[in-house]
Every structure is written in structure tokens, then in C-alpha cells.
Regions:
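Short, surface-exposed coil-to-beta transition loops
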Residues: 58-63, 93-97, 121-125, 234-238
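Short hydrophobic/aromatic-rich beta-strand segments that constitute the beta-sheet cores
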Residues: 45, 76-78, 109-113, 250-253
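Mature, soluble, non-transmembrane domains
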Residues: 112-277
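N-terminal cleavable signal peptides for secretion/export
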Residues: 31-91
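Bacterial N-terminal signal peptides
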Residues: 14-27
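N-terminal secretory signal peptides that target proteins for export/translocation
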Residues: 1-13
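A short, structured loop/turn motif at beta-sheet edges
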Residues: 34-38, 66-75, 101-107, 212-214, ...
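Hydrophobic/aromatic-rich structural module bridging two neighboring secondary-structure elements via a short loop
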Residues: 78-130
Length: 277
């Protein structure tokens, strides 16, 4: 799941993605046997809490997410629609369309973003990034500055590779995972330092009914996101989610410090995988 930032109101809404995928987006490398299950999911989002300083009275919205497998990589698509209601009676509406492609070896990543709202001009841009084994030095390019490369940290992760490594660490019983993560967003927000805490596997039980996509257990994961250029010890936001071994997220929360939202899975279906030679 990729983070969305709304500077006018002083907060961000995520895709882990960061998160998922931010938050919901993840990759495999050539040597890894794990495969993520292609699927399409719809999440309903609501405000959990808000400080009085935000003047927020409610947040509602929906996230439509899909993970599609291709023979040479994965395609992720996310469509957000969020409505922020304030005590003054004002309403802010944000719509975002995001799509990315990540190569199966984890070395290539491309993305496109289309964002609109009722308080800022429409925003459209795309870009791509390389990292080993495709190139010696990781770097990214953006359509708004096509002739200027953004250097990336040597050990940078793209979203899908980050989550598969996270899953591998969870399987081994490891609890902590720190990494630099590249998102498909604007250059000044494209790199975030992350600290992940991986909880003990929990029985799925009746928490999530997802048909053939339901796994016997999930890992509770919390990821804190930091600006690598800042010395602040407090994260910009934190993403907590239930991650199944097949890559499906059955529930997630995002905490921005002054307010938080959660996302309940309301619809999900498996998507076909390609037949590759």
C-alpha cells in the first residue's frame, strides 16, 4: 500500500506498504520459492481516533486493491476514495489511483500515480527505479524531472521484495526488521526508513472469512516509517496489519499520530495466475 500525503491538512494517509504495502504491495526475487497469491480485495476505511487539534469528526472511505501475477513480475493496482469531515462542517475528499509493476528478480520497479481532491490541483506523474542485480548503483527517475536521477540507498527495497523478506523472517521466528523502502510517490517522499516488529503467528479463526484465500494463521506486523533526512525519533506514521503467508492482508490500521484509521476487509476474490514456460 503506498502512502498518500496531504500537506494542506498536515497529515498523511497510507500500502505498506508500504504498505503496504504498504503496505499491501510486495515482490519476490529469483532465488525465492515463495509465491504471493494473486487477488483482488476491497477494504472499508473508518476513523478510529483523532486529537481535538485536528478538528476531525470522521474519516470514511474505501480502498480497492489488486495483485496480479505476470510471468516476469507482479502488477499492483490501488484505488482510494477518502472523505475527511471536520467539526466546522468542511469536507475534504481525496481520490487516488496507483499502479506499479515489479520485476520478479526485485531489480526493476515502475509506477504511475493520479491524485485528485477538492482542495488541491490534480496531480499525475510516473516513474521507474533500478537496483541490483539490474544495475550497480540503485537510482530512480520521475516524469516531473526525467533527466535527474534520485540516488537510492545501496540496500534499498522495493515494496514487494520488502514484504517477502518480512514473511521469510516471520517464518524463521525473527521479530525485528529494519530497511530502507522506496515507494512510487513524489521524490521528496519516495524513500522511507522502516522499522518492523513481527508478532507471533495468530490463529485466523473467525477473524477473516476469505474462502480459498484463508490461511490457518497470520502474522501481526507493525511498521514505523521515518524520514531518512530527519533526526526525529518519532515516526511519521505507523502501519499495523494482519499478514497471511500467502501475502493477503486481512486487516490493517494506520496511525498518523494525531489521528488513526482502520481498514476492514469486506470483499476478496482470487485472481488467475499465468501459465509460464
Amino acid at each position: 500500500m503506498t502512502p498518500l500525503f496531504f500537506p494542506k491538512y498536515g497529515f498523511a494517509a497510507k500500502s505498506l506498504a508500504s504498505v503496504v504495502g504498504a503496505m499491501l504491495i510486495f515482490s519476490i526475487t529469483a532465488g525465492q520459492a515463495r509465491e504471493l497469491t494473486p487477488h483482488k480485495a476491497i477494504y472499508e476505511m473508518r476513523m478510529m481516533s483523532a486529537d481535538s487539534e485536528t478538528q476531525l469528526s470522521d474519516v470514511t472511505g474505501q480502498n480497492e486493491f489488486s495483485l496480479t501475477r505476470e510471468c516476469d513480475g507482479y502488477v499492483v493496482a490501488e484505488n482510494y476514495l477518502l472523505e475527511f469531515s471536520y467539526g466546522s462542517g468542511e469536507t475534504a475528499i481525496i481520490a487516488s489511483q496507483f499502479q506499479s509493476w515489479e520485476h520478479i528478480d526485485g531489480g526493476l520497479y515502475s509506477f504511475s500515480v493520479h491524485e485528485g481532491s477538492n482542495f488541491e490541483p490534480e496531480k499525475k506523474f510516473d516513474g521507474y527505479a533500478y537496483r541490483p542485480p539490474q544495475v550497480a548503483e540503485p537510482e530512480a527517475f520521475f516524469s516531473m524531472q526525467p533527466n535527474s536521477a534520485l540516488p537510492l540507498p545501496n540496500a534499498v527495497y522495493f515494496p514487494l521484495a520488502h514484504t517477502l523478506d518480512l514473511l521469510d523472517k516471520a517464518d524463521k521466528g525473527e521479530k525485528l526488521f529494519s530497511a530502507d523502502l522506496f515507494f512510487g510517490t513524489e521524490p521528496d517522499k519516495a524513500i522511507r526508513r522502516t522499522n518492523s516488529v513481527i508478532g507471533k503467528a495468530q490463529d485466523t479463526g473467525e477473524i477473516a472469512k476469505m474462502g480459498s484465500l484463508t490461511e490457518p494463521f497470520y502474522y501481526p506486523v507493525q511498521i514505523a516509517y521515518f524520514d531518512p533526512k530527519s533526526s526525529e525519533s518519532v515516526p511519521e506514521y505507523e502501519h499495523t496489519f494482519h499478514l497471511q503467508p500467502n501475502g493477503v492482508i486481512s486487516y490493517y490500521e494506520i496511525d498518523y499520530g494525531d489521528f488513526s484509521v482502520d481498514a476492514q476487509l469486506v470483499e476478496i476474490e482470487a485472481l488467475p495466475a499465468p501459465i509460464c514456460s
